[in-house]
């Protein structure tokens, strides 16, 4: 299998919100496959500049006239559910002209036609797992096409039109649109309550994963993390329905019941900001060593998913492990922003309580390994609905850190809810010193003033908290000369 000619309806495409993580990736692939692409975004960005350099015509601001950027106008207009309201002037103009408006997942599904399609979904870990699989396959000599929700540090991009017959992509479950896809293999990392503003109940949210598993053809494979209760339950249901399931995790075959275990994580240990793990693959007599440059048990599990999947499609395991050893991570996934003396500043996209807990456990492990310093988190809640629903859980997770700074809520697409601010989380944090910083202009200075040699600082959230990392590094440099030597008095 391989991609055929670009579908006629995708020859001239206008994309509303073209600079977003998901939309920019689609634009890159369209351009690489010969499409004419125009688009609009609210502001200039690195993504917009990169697309312009590749030939896209991009308007800053939203205006119906943007549909005239391409000679003859677009054959379709592409948008997303989450970020673009139906009242957007470009969508209104497209409807007036009778130009079809397609959602991003529909276009991605069209672009994946003809490939062996490997998709990664789950509440957490999608981007990291997808990226690990891509890097592993590239190291094995594959040239997969891919579309991922973050920028791979190795490739410097979030999408690529490859020469091979494999397409690797992230399947976002947040609005149920993943049901547009018809993959050959699905990885499910975990399933727990999220996006209840769309689904209304945990049951409805979980059901979309069952429906997605049903899209696998008779030769399809479902790769599932058995350490996660929600994903393990899905694996059992799918296995009972005759879907070919391959489990991975800490469980051995006896613990997994009837679900076949393809890969077992037997042991893992921190190694600075990386890890070394022992894994046992089905059918092999001895465990293998897996080395990673990214920290945390959750990352070891994500890497194991990539190993199991790559082996499933015929990749050599030794080459897969070599590729994973060189995996440099993904932008905004435990990304090193900078270091000043012995203080390191990282940035992470974590915006759900489980993600926050998992990342902070990894941070605490790194700090404990170095023997001095503290874990310092700067957290920005994302969405009023999520903050209201999970304030207690966020507080519990943040309490893992030694020092906590909480910013106000980044509302994104939502209007404020009465009484829902960052203070709702702050008042429930116990066991760690906590500071509420609703004024973003004061964050960098206050964090730097509270930081000491050996501390590991991490900014965390899905909003503009990511901009604070560089500001904190600058503020730390301004006061570094006043610090005592690392570990002094600690």
Curated annotation (Swiss-Prot):
Its EC number is 6.3.2.8. Pathway: Cell wall biogenesis; peptidoglycan biosynthesis. GO terms for molecular function: ATP binding; UDP-N-acetylmuramate-L-alanine ligase activity. It is an enzyme of class 6 (ligase). GO terms for biological process: cell division; cell wall organization; peptidoglycan biosynthetic process; regulation of cell shape. It catalyses: UDP-N-acetyl-alpha-D-muramate + L-alanine + ATP = UDP-N-acetyl-alpha-D-muramoyl-L-alanine + ADP + phosphate + H(+). GO terms for cellular component: cytoplasm. The keyword Cell division applies. It is found in: Cytoplasm. The keyword Oxidoreductase does not apply. ATP binds at residues 122-128. Keywords: ATP-binding, Cell cycle, Cell division, Cell shape, Cell wall biogenesis/degradation, Cytoplasm, Ligase, Nucleotide-binding, Peptidoglycan synthesis. InterPro entries: Mur-like_cat_sf, Mur_ligase_C, Mur_ligase_C_dom_sf, Mur_ligase_cen, Mur_ligase_N, MurCDEF_pg_biosynth, UDP-N-AcMur_Ala_ligase_MurC. Belongs to the MurCDEF family. Cell wall formation. This is UDP-N-acetylmuramate--L-alanine ligase. The lineage of its organism: Bacteria, Bacillati, Actinomycetota, Actinomycetes, Mycobacteriales.
